[in-house]
Amino acid sequence: GIDIAPRVLRQLFFLAYDRRNIAPILADCAHPEEYDYRICMCDFLIQDIAQKGQLEIFLKNLKFLKPGGTGFLAIKARSIDVTKPPYKIFEQVKKQLEENKIKIIDYKTLDPFEKDHCVFVIQK
């Protein structure tokens, strides 16, 4: 698990103690070149961040996902562009995933639980 916040990483450390398949890494997920030497290929990749380049960051980190592996991408539309309707952003993300030859297994908006959020489940 990668996080840039030391407090969050401390919590992740305790979780990783019980779950041996998680390794806590203090880093910025937008720069995988800074931590790629510490990561092996994974079966499952989860990204849940609130940054403008959410999709681009996910695509950069997909190199760590094994062929046939599953990815989970949470998109926060308002973090990408507050001026566009969320459904347009979700359509744009879907199109870009398809253009990158990413197989979309499912995607759902999270309304009414989380406003302006959508999740994509993909397979590499």
Name these PLM-found stretches.
Residues 2-54:
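S-adenosyl-L-methionine
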Residues 8-14, 18, 59-123:
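C-terminal substrate-binding/active-site "lid" region of AdoMet-derived donor-dependent transferases
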